[in-house]
């Protein structure tokens, strides 16, 4: 099994950018976009479609890349919506019981 800590590290960076926006930060640009949460939701939709196409076309390298993009943008959208990823993890854990 791979190290899942990278998701926590990415989440921490996203939280940091939300609290302290940086001019050169992609995350900050999405979170402070004039479209508000719609920008991050657009990115989730875009990356979901790209992931679906890569998986359907059985292109492993592209599927991995698009899955990473989708996970990343999902985390950004969670932050934009004020949802803590810990609550999502708790929900997943509850479903295993």
UniProtKB/Swiss-Prot annotation:
Pfam family for this entry, one: PRA-PH
Location within or outside the cell: Cytoplasm
Disulfide linkage: none
GO molecular function per UniProt: ATP binding; phosphoribosyl-ATP diphosphatase activity
Reactions this protein catalyses: 1-(5-phospho-beta-D-ribosyl)-ATP + H2O = 1-(5-phospho-beta-D-ribosyl)-5'-AMP + diphosphate + H(+)
HAMAP family: HisE
Family membership: Belongs to the PRA-PH family.
Name the UniProt record assigns to this protein: Phosphoribosyl-ATP pyrophosphatase
UniProt organism field: Methanoculleus marisnigri (strain ATCC 35101 / DSM 1498 / JR1)
Lineage: Archaea, Methanobacteriati, Methanobacteriota, Stenosarchaea group, Methanomicrobia
